[in-house]
Curated annotation (Swiss-Prot):
Similarity comment: family membership: Belongs to the FPG family.
Gene source species: Ruthia magnifica subsp. Calyptogena magnifica
Family annotation (InterPro entries): DNA_glyclase/AP_lyase_DNA-bd, DNA_glyclase_Znf_dom_DNA_BS, Formamido-pyr_DNA_Glyclase, FPG_cat, MutM-like_N-ter, Ribosomal_uS13-like_H2TH, Znf_DNA_glyclase/AP_lyase
UniProt zinc finger (FPG-type) residues: 235-269
Biological processes annotated in GO: base-excision repair
Gene: mutM
E.C. no: 3.2.2.23, 4.2.99.18
Entry's cofactor comment: Binds 1 zinc ion per subunit.
Binding site for DNA: H91, R110, K150
Pfam families attached to this UniProt entry: Fapy_DNA_glyco (PF01149), H2TH (PF06831)
Role of this protein: Involved in base excision repair of DNA damaged by oxidation or by mutagenic agents. Acts as a DNA glycosylase that recognizes and removes damaged bases. Has a preference for oxidized purines, such as 7,8-dihydro-8-oxoguanine (8-oxoG). Has AP (apurinic/apyrimidinic) lyase activity and introduces nicks in the DNA strand. Cleaves the DNA backbone by beta-delta elimination to generate a single-strand break at the site of the removed base with both 3'- and 5'-phosphates.
Name listed for the protein in its UniProt record: Formamidopyrimidine-DNA glycosylase
Subunit structure: Monomer.
Cofactor(s) the protein needs: Zn(2+)
Amino acid sequence: MPELPEVEITKRGLVPLIINQEVSRVILHRENLRWAIPKNLITILANQKIKTIKRRAKYLLIKFEAGTLIIHLGMSGSIKVVDIKTPLLKHEHFELQFNNGTSMRLNDPRRFGAVLFSKDGSHKLLDSLGVEPLEAVFNNGYLYQKSRNKRKNIKDFIMDSKIVVGVGNIYACESLFMASINPQRKAGNVSKTRYKILTQCIKDILTQAIKAGGTTLQDFSQVDGNPGYFTQTLSVYGCENKTCHFCKSKIIKIVQNQRSTFYCRKCQT
């Protein structure tokens, strides 16, 4: 699933290709993804220029004079910008064509993504989001303060988008391994010192993943079509029964809240 690094990489790849481009045509190759795609986008975005593109959590916010296009990549989505004459691929469900002869296409095989629109840039899906992990507000004391009296496990806690956004399953596993914290430990039982270490580990893991172009496990690709290379540096995620880099014991897999969790029982306490 595209997580914060993959969405950030997508945003950075789109900036030089679509900023200031004028939409000549909007095509809905299917009427719905996770939710219905607004049909009035065909008229609302016609002849509109793209002013900015930003990321909030795992959402892409594409700003026009008329409002903001909100895109979520879902479980399997990716975006590419291609020549307008390029043959349409099977799972390319939404398309913005530009006057310069290029086309931005959303590919979403599993159709859990979303294409939404807001006139003022606000949306109920954005209203309850927590802080951005790569911004200064996500500081050494933030997680500790939020975790007091929390009984949920630490992994589910840092994956809660109302607490901090964008720390998906892959990066939660990797961050907890780097911080030597057992993913089953209760969030309220983690010390302030360990939260300080975990906060920096989350920042470091996400930054490394962005530099590597994200993680490609199955469907994700960058705007230029290349895969993300952070997959090659994963320490625990997807590494069941492989050897821990540090203690040489086996990485184990458990299930937490219907998600696979990978960790080292010896290194993570």
